[in-house]
């Protein structure tokens, strides 16, 4: 039986340079939050908590699951849209 990491390794991601499909509107807003839930809940690990309290986002490898969209919807600090056609996650099952 395969581990989830092995299955995720088979997926590919086509980066749309200069056009990320997720954007943190105000990075300073995240420093005010005591819990940075996106850094824990994102299955792809796209969010990182920095030592200064800020949250950085790298969308390369995003699974487009929408978890961050749900977690951050109350704050309204996240801009999330589907990637353009031909870009984003390319699932490979096998």
UniProtKB/Swiss-Prot annotation:
Gene3D superfamilies per record: 3.30.70.20
One Pfam family it belongs to: Fer4_ETF_QO
GO molecular function: iron ion binding; iron-sulfur cluster binding
GO BP terms: nitrogen fixation
Keywords tagged on the record: Electron transport, Iron, Iron-sulfur, Metal-binding, Nitrogen fixation, Repeat, Transport
Purpose of the protein: Could be a 3Fe-4S cluster-containing protein.
PANTHER family to which the protein is assigned, alphabetical: FERREDOXIN-LIKE, FERREDOXIN-LIKE PROTEIN YDIT
Protein name (database record): Ferredoxin-like protein
């Amino acid at each position: 039986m395969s581990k989830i990491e092995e299955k995720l390794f088979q997926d590919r991601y086509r980066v749309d340079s200069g056009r990320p499909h997720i954007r943190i509107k105000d990075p300073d807003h995240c420093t005010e939050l005591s819990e940075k839930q996106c850094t824990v809940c994102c299955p792809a690990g796209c969010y990182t908590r920095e030592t200064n309290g800020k949250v950085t986002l790298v969308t390369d490898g995003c699974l487009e699951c929408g978890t961050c969209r749900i977690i951050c919807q109350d704050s309204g600090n996240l801009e999330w849209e589907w990637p353009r056609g031909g870009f984003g996650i390319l699932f490979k099952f096998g």
